[in-house]
C-alpha cells in the first residue's frame, strides 16, 4: 500500500489518544541529566555551544531581559533536539504541527508584550505611531501597526512549520525517486541518492538554524519591550 505523502505529518495516536506529549518529552528521556559531574568532550562541546549562543543572544539585553536567558536556552535546545530527532526514519516531528508551534509562539510573544506594557508603557504605546507621522495617516498607521504586532506570533510559528515541513517533503520525494530509479537507471539512482545525502546534511543544519531563528526572534521581541 502506497503511503500518503503527508502521512508522516499526522499526529500519531495510541488507543485513540494522541501521544504528542510523550514524543515531546522524548528528548529529555533520551538525554537524562547525569547524577554526578561528568567532564568529557561531549559535555565540554555542549557547554561551549550553550555559552556561545547565550552570549550572542543575551548581549543586546539589559538586566531585566537577561532574566529570560534560562528560558531562551531551554527553548533553543528543545526545538533543536526535536527537529533533529524528527529526521530519524519512521519518526514524528512535532514542530511540523502548526498547532504546537502556535502553542509555543503565542505565549512567548504575549509574555514579551505584557512585559513591555508593564514596565515601559509609554514606549510600547509609541510603537503604534511612528514619530513624525502626518495627522491624516495616524488612524491608518495605528491599524497597520496593530495588525503587524498581532501577526508576529503567527509568522513565528508559520516560519518554523514551513521550513521543517518543506525539508521533510523534499527528503520524502527524493527518497521515493531514488527507489523508483533503481530499476530503471542505476547511474541516475546513484545521483539522486547523492543528492539525498547532501539534502539530509542540509536538513540537519536547517533543524539547528530554525531553532536558533525562532529563539532569536523571541529574544528580539523581548528586547523591544524591555
From Swiss-Prot:
Record function comment: Subunit a, of the mitochondrial membrane ATP synthase complex (F(1)F(0) ATP synthase or Complex V) that produces ATP from ADP in the presence of a proton gradient across the membrane which is generated by electron transport complexes of the respiratory chain. ATP synthase complex consist of a soluble F(1) head domain - the catalytic core - and a membrane F(1) domain - the membrane proton channel. These two domains are linked by a central stalk rotating inside the F(1) region and a stationary peripheral stalk.
Gene for this chain: MT-ATP6
Entry-linked CDD domains: ATP-synt_Fo_a_6
Membrane topology designation: Multi-pass membrane protein
Oligomeric and partner information: Component of the ATP synthase complex composed at least of ATP5F1A/subunit alpha, ATP5F1B/subunit beta, ATP5MC1/subunit c (homooctomer), MT-ATP6/subunit a, MT-ATP8/subunit 8, ATP5ME/subunit e, ATP5MF/subunit f, ATP5MG/subunit g, ATP5MK/subunit k, ATP5MJ/subunit j, ATP5F1C/subunit gamma, ATP5F1D/subunit delta, ATP5F1E/subunit epsilon, ATP5PF/subunit F6, ATP5PB/subunit b, ATP5PD/subunit d, ATP5PO/subunit OSCP.
GO CC terms: mitochondrial inner membrane; proton-transporting ATP synthase complex
Protein name: ATP synthase F(0) complex subunit a
Compartments (UniProt record): Mitochondrion inner membrane
Transmembrane stretches, start-end: 6-26, 68-88, 97-117, 136-156, 164-184, 189-209
InterPro entries, A to Z: ATP_synth_F0_asu, ATP_synth_F0_asu_AS, ATP_synth_F0_asu_bact/mt, F0_ATP_A_sf
Pfam families: ATP-synt_A
GO BP, one annotated term: proton motive force-driven ATP synthesis
Single GO MF annotation: proton channel activity
